[in-house]
């Protein structure tokens, strides 16, 4: 019998060339297309409740939407979700919004986080494909409100890149954040966000980018025609939306015209669903994400 946390995928469309797997007992190989010539291929990675909630405004540090949506840490489904996220961090580099960085003071966007089980095979899988040991950690921040002592900025071997605006660059300087690479552009406009990702590709060699949110960042990328696909884990938790302020929902994928490429679950008794949605090209405005970056 194989590993009970290995997701069994059903493929509806060809996703791209197979990347391979660090351990076939734990992970099925996933495929990715070649990235566009002038920017990274960007895929979102999120967890949502059974009724589509991805986040809400926290009352305090203990009011963690992701932990509540995921449920018991010992469930096989939750372990499978964590392992999928870690696998997706081996594909290329990883990005996250400044709000998430502020809310998670121990977060490091690496295949093995400090509290994880040891997983040297994930790093060997990266290195064998010509990638650096750790993925580059990319932070999106409109205003430069990044904690200077956050481990993304201070962990040896992790190369942080902050994507920000002119105002954000000034705030980073005020906070004496000097060791991170910085890309500056007009991120509140789709064209500025597009230019920033062109620079990620041209100046830093970012070919594949896993964006772990939050939803405001993902929506901005989508509006700028940059978000190519989404990996969505849906749990069995139903969130009472009336009990929270500032509730954020995931995309309505059908309304967005997205195509379901793959769907997975644990067999025989898994309750989470793991879906992979691919977008068509989109356009729009990124202005509404300004308050959280």
Put a short name on every predicted segment.
Residues 1-293:
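Enzymes that bind and transform nitrogen-containing heteroaromatic metabolites
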């Amino acid at each position: 019998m194989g590993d009970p946390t290995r997701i069994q995928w059903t493929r509806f469309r060809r996703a791209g060339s197979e990347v391979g797997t660090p351990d076939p007992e734990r992970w099925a190989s996933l495929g990715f297309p070649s990235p566009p010539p002038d920017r990274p291929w960007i895929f979102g990675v999120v967890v949502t409740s059974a009724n589509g909630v991805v986040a809400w405004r926290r009352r305090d540090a203990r009011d963690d939407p992701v932990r509540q949506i995921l449920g018991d840490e010992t469930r096989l489904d939750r372990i499978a979700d964590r392992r999928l996220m870690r696998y997706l961090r081996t594909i290329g580099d990883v990005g996250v919004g400044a709000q998430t960085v502020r809310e998670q003071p121990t977060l490091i966007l690496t295949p093995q986080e400090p509290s994880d089980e040891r997983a040297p095979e994930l790093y060997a899988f990266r290195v064998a494909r010509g990638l650096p040991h750790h993925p580059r950690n990319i932070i999106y921040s409109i205003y430069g409100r990044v904690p200077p002592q956050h481990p993304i900025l201070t962990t040896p071997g992790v190369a942080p890149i902050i994507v920000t605006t002119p105002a954000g660059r000034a705030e980073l300087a005020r906070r004496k954040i000097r060791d991170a690479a910085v890309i500056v552009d007009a991120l509140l406009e789709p064209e500025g966000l597009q230019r920033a990702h062109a620079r990620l590709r041209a100046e830093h060699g970012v070919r594949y980018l896993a964006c772990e949110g939050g939803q405001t960042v993902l929506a901005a990328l989508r509006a700028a025609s940059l978000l190519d696909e989404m990996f969505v884990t849906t749990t069995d938790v139903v969130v009472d939306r009336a009990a929270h302020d500032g509730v954020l929902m995931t995309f309505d994928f059908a309304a967005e015209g997205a195509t379901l490429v793959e769907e997975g679950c644990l067999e025989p008794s898994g309750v989470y669903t793991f879906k992979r949605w691919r977008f068509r090209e989109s356009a729009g405005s990124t202005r509404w994400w300004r308050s959280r970056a």
